Amino acid sequence: MRVLAAMSGGVDSAVAAARAVAAGHDVVGVHLALSQDPQTVRESSRGCCSLEDSADARRVCDKLGIPFYVWDFSDRFKEDVIDDFISSYEAGETPNPCLRCNEKIKFAALLERGIALGFDAVVTGHYARLTQPVDGGDGYLRRSIDPDKDQSYVLGVLGAHEIAHCMFPVGDTVKPKIREEAAAMGFSVAKKPDSYDICFIPDGNTQAFLGRHIGLRPGMIVDSDGNELKEHDGAWNYTIGQRKGLDIKQPAADGKPRYVTNIDAATGTVTVGSRENLKVIALTADRLKYLHPAMTGSFEAEVQVRAHGSVVACSVMVNESDDTMRVELHTPLSGVARGQAAVIYLPDDDGDIVLGSGTICATEHQ
């Protein structure tokens, strides 16, 4: 097959590309330029779109003897990821920009251009697996065999079309072995640290970034009874489950710590309460993605609402008429926020299968 290897400049994508070459595919490496000013992305920030990352990706492709290109997706990245991130916080949500980047840029936009140029698939270094059903057809997305690095959650927001054109060559290997393989091939990125920061906020100061783009929008912090506790500069400063940085002088009546339990973006009201007030027993999600035939009607499954977060058993009711699902949690979860992705899994001894996902739009508490 003729495949595009998405080269982030890290060790995982390097080994994924190498394995695709070894498998006999016609491979072309491509690095996505996502920053409109890559000079501002510090090399020490562990982002994924710095100039150094691009140089690392080029060196890997040179060693593999495959063509290398840089595609500028910075305008689309700003619109679909950065602007979406800002507007989500304005709406009182807690978005994950890496999920949006996967959904809109690293797969949808990349595939759109790749298919137009005659490529059959995209190869990435994500830790996930695709297995073919016994009756043929498109593969099912499964967890990686490395539970510490599994990225099936962040891929659960993809559509069936994207999954059908994906290859994840490193999903059947644990990370230490990937580094060993990279070192054996002489890749300079073999010991390169993993990236964790939001690439467009390289200093990690999300509040300062949002403050520059949203500005002051004063509102009140209130307790669960509606008593006003203090004024704040903007509800975007807060996320569900937040404890630190509230700076409330008046202690709670029971003396226990307070947590952000609700954000009303329309009024700018931030509600705080006890840890017990955080426990969610059910959620509603919209913008559904269907990745498996079992993602229909009512069924029992498991749900994950954060990358590397807890996985709990649940009862799912999919309403395809309005593209929503209700998920009743068998074990309450804390810190569940609107804007997060709820990814549904079917437990399986060979690796849990991703059935689909949705964006959380409402929660119900104990």
Curated annotation (Swiss-Prot):
GO molecular function: ATP binding; tRNA binding; tRNA-uridine 2-sulfurtransferase activity
Keywords: ATP-binding, Cytoplasm, Disulfide bond, Nucleotide-binding, RNA-binding, Transferase, tRNA processing, tRNA-binding
Site entry: Interaction with tRNA: H126, Q340
Entry GO terms, CC: cytoplasm
Catalyses which reaction(s): S-sulfanyl-L-cysteinyl-[protein] + uridine(34) in tRNA + AH2 + ATP = 2-thiouridine(34) in tRNA + L-cysteinyl-[protein] + A + AMP + diphosphate + H(+)
E.C. number: 2.8.1.13
Domain of life, per lineage: Bacteria
Residues binding ATP: A6, M7, S8, G9, G10, V11, D12, S13, L32, G125
Pfam family, one: tRNA_Me_trans_C
Cell compartments where the protein resides: Cytoplasm
Main location: cytoplasm
HAMAP family: tRNA_thiouridyl_MnmA
Function: Catalyzes the 2-thiolation of uridine at the wobble position (U34) of tRNA, leading to the formation of s(2)U34.
UniProt similarity note: Belongs to the MnmA/TRMU family.
Name assigned to this protein: tRNA-specific 2-thiouridylase MnmA
Organism expressing this protein natively: Corynebacterium diphtheriae (strain ATCC 700971 / NCTC 13129 / Biotype gravis)
Upper classification of the organism: Bacteria, Bacillati, Actinomycetota, Actinomycetes, Mycobacteriales
Name of the coding gene: mnmA
